[in-house]
């Protein structure tokens, strides 16, 4: 069985304290993969998100996290980006560097991860 580059997979692993979900998500030229660790020591509705490996149009970005809201949050889940310091000393989120297609992919990715964490 051949592997389709656009196949999105999620695997669940259970090890009591170190439960995590491993994901591999792609759409077109964009791809993301990594692990989401489930925090068993607080609330079952609380998720501890490790930085995910993210690649957009071949550009690798480290330090991203996924925001998964609890309760009714109109914004829904989202990707939290690290910031970089520009020449003026201001911190600017990487989010402002991306095209509309990339933003759409990031929204899909965040929703995919949120759905898998339910």
Regions found by a protein language model. Give the residues of each.
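Single-stranded nucleic acid-binding surfaces, predominantly the OB-fold ssDNA-binding core
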Residues: 2-118
């Amino acid at each position: 069985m051949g592997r389709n580059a656009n196949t999105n997979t999620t695997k669940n692993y259970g090890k009591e304290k170190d439960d995590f979900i491993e994901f591999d998500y792609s759409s077109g030229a964009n791809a993301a993969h990594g692990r989401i660790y489930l925090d068993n020591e607080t609330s079952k509705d609380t998720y501890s998100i490790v930085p995910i490996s993210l690649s957009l149009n071949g550009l690798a970005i480290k330090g991203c996290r996924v925001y998964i809201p609890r309760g009714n949050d109109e914004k829904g889940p989202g990707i939290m980006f690290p910031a970089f310091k520009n020449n003026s000393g201001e911190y600017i989120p990487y989010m402002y560097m991306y095209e509309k297609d990339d933003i759409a992919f990031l929204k899909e990715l965040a929703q995919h991860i949120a759905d898998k964490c339910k």
